[in-house]
Amino acid sequence: CATLHVAAAHGGDAILFLMPADHIIRDLEAFGAAAARAAELASQGKLVTLGIEPQHAETAYGYIEADGESVLRFVEKPSKEKAQEYLASGRFYWNGGMLVYRADTMLKLLEQHCADILQASRASLAVASPLDGAGGEGVVFDASTFARIPALSIDYALLEKTDGIAVVPSNIGWSDVGSWNSIAELTDADEAGNRVQGDAVLIGS
């Protein structure tokens, strides 16, 4: 729906950056460089993802196998043994769920691989209302028509069926904040191993 709205408002050559809202990126300079490279590739008509350079053999993330800036395949969350193989190979990146693309590129791929999703999205956007205070950049979708859009992840609906996807290897201080271990990595521990943000009184801890 967002891609349709942006294409209508800004044209098919508009570049969109699709990313999760609940992840953390700590190295903004590196992120800016990666985003600029991704936008450059996207402007050439490529569907682009950011591949997070793995810091350890993680089993909680999907992986991207790559040859340079070309995606070879997306793989599901691996076993510990497979994750160690991926890390040692130097060809695999964590899949952080970020995509960069031209609006017309995405619409063409949706038409090709999942036309039902595109059709339902168009129907929902057609009856959407302008979002107050957004200057025409935002809309509020009608709940009933939006609910008719098939609920299928973009990985299954599109990425696994699309050839020629590009990847930008990225070391950007990324975390999905998806586990206690990942939360612990975001803050320094005191001498007793406690990690605290804000005012706190620790007693016997």
Segments predicted by a language model, with ranges:
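Conserved beta-loop-beta/alpha segment of the NTase-like Rossmann-fold superfamily
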Residues: 1-68, 100-101, 108-113
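A residue-level structural signature of the nucleotidyltransferase/glycosyltransferase Rossmann-like core
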Residues: 16, 72, 91, 98-99, ...
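Structured helix-beta-strand junction loops
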Residues: 44-45, 89, 161-164
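Glycine- and other small-residue-rich loops at beta-strand/loop junctions that grip anionic moieties
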Residues: 50-53, 72-75, 98, 147
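Nucleotide-activated chemistry modules centered on ATP-dependent adenylation/adenylyltransferase
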Residues: 58-60, 77, 127
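A short, charged helix-loop
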Residues: 66-93
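A conserved mid-domain beta-alpha-beta active-site/ligand-binding segment of alpha/beta enzyme cores
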Residues: 87, 92-101, 110
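Left-handed beta-helix
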Residues: 101-205
